[in-house]
């Protein structure tokens, strides 16, 4: 019989947090399999390299179960580098570089500060502090501030040459209260303030639009996919609904005070080595918001950002077949696949200046070869937006929606 469960050897992580993770009833006999399962649960929290355990003699003929997790040798201040590159080998070439820093275990309750900077086609800054409310607590507070700068072009009809270049700038700050579901996801609710602007880069006239408001927001994120790039199991859901109390700006009263964005994906196994990833996205921004569509797997065959508007609907079926067994000499996963995509963006503040160019549904398809390399996934994609354009595009990085 086990009389006590202990956690030993920790320097940074709070032992009480680990104990709160362990689901073992010491009133009943504890088997080696139960202890091993508890060790796996501790490891799955992501704080340790390994979680060895042992049984030691206890009082009155009992035993003491001792977990001795091995803290990460790199510590809990992590710096990560990423990004993406997209090129059609002609006029459409974009890149983004992402640098993120996470500083964990800043206090006994497991406070974590995350900062992210992105440079390139889209410029972005994010800073948030995740503070659990208690040792091993699932409730948390999270102050958050973000800024994003994103360009978009204005096209007329079927022309591939933009008649104007613009950018959106959005600043947002808020405080959120949420609940964490272990190894599943989180939900949160909060309030804050945002400021959004559209500015002209090049156009026949200098157009400027602004909007700002306080808001309340409900957000949810769940992710059980077994792989970030080529999943076979699990699901992904990310959604938010935001109500703006009193939007003020240069456009006048908005059509709606509600903003939302929903993204979802689920892989379906079609065979031992073949998977269909079904995904979709729907969104409505503020009157001074903007979504871009065009580029790899986002109406393939069209230039990056070919279509824009403040309303978006998009669906995609992405099939990939693992051919690594027939190409073992490359020593990395190789996939052959194809996609079918359908989407539309509409109701753009700028496009309405010359008439909405983004209303029709557009369909696209692609064939591609991909590899999940140690530098990240790489794709060579032959795409076609039906009735519009075609392209051969190289893409490196995690897929964007």
Language-model regions, residue ranges each:
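Second-shell loop/turn segments in exported
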Residues: 3-8, 23-29, 85-88, 113-116, ...
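Structured segments of extracytoplasmic/periplasmic soluble domains
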Residues: 8, 21-27, 38-45, 104
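A generic beta-sheet turn/junction motif
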Residues: 11, 60, 271, 371-375
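Gram-negative/organellar outer-membrane beta-barrel architecture
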Residues: 32-33, 37-41, 47-225, 296-300, ...
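C-terminal outer-membrane beta-barrel translocator/porin domains of Gram-negative envelope proteins
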Residues: 78-88, 204-206, 213-342, 346-348, ...
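Soluble non-cytosolic domains of exported or imported proteins
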Residues: 8-16, 25-36, 92, 120
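Acidic, glycine-rich low-complexity/disordered segments
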Residues: 1-25, 183-186
């Amino acid at each position: 019989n086990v009389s006590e469960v202990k956690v030993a050897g920790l320097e940074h992580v709070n032992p009480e947090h680990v104990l709160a993770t362990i689901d073992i009833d010491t009133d009943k006999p504890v088997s080696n399999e139960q202890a091993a399962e508890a060790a796996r649960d501790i490891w799955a929290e992501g704080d340790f390299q390994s979680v060895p355990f042992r049984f030691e003699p206890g009082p009155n003929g009992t035993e003491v179960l001792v977990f001795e997790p091995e803290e990460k040798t790199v510590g809990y201040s992590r710096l990560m580098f990423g990004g993406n590159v997209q090129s059609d080998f002609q006029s459409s070439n974009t890149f983004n570089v992402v640098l993120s820093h996470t500083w964990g275990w800043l206090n006994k309750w497991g406070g974590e500060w995350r900062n992210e900077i992105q440079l390139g086609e889209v410029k972005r800054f994010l800073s948030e502090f995740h503070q659990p409310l208690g040792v091993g607590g699932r409730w948390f507070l999270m102050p958050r501030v973000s800024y994003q700068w994103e360009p978009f072009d204005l096209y007329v009809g079927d022309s591939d040459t933009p008649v104007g270049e613009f950018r959106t700038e959005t600043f947002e700050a808020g405080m959120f209260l949420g609940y964490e579901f272990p190894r599943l996801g989180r939900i949160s609710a909060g309030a804050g303030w945002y400021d959004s602007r559209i500015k002209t880069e090049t156009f026949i006239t200098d157009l400027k639009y602004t909007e700002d408001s306080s808001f309340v927001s409900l957000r949810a994120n769940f992710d059980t996919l077994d792989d970030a790039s080529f999943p076979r199991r699990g699901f992904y859901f990310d959604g938010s609904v935001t109500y703006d109390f009193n939007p003020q700006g240069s456009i006048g009263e908005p059509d709606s005070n509600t903003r939302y964005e929903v993204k979802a994906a689920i892989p379906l196994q079609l065979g031992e080595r073949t998977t269909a990833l079904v995904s979709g996205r729907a969104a409505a921004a503020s009157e001074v918001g903007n979504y871009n569509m065009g580029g790899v797997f986002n109406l393939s065959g069209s230039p990056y950002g070919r279509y824009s508007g403040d309303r978006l609907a998009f669906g995609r079926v992405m099939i990939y077949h693992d051919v690594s067994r027939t190409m073992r000499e490359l020593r990395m996963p190789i996939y052959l696949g194809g996609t079918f995509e359908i989407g539309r963006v509409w109701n753009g503040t700028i496009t309405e200046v010359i008439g909405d160019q983004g209303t029709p549904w557009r369909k696209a398809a692609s064939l591609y070869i991909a590899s999940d390399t140690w530098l990240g996934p790489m794709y060579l994609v032959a795409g076609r937006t039906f009735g519009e354009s075609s392209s051969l595009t190289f893409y490196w990085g995690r897929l964007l929606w």
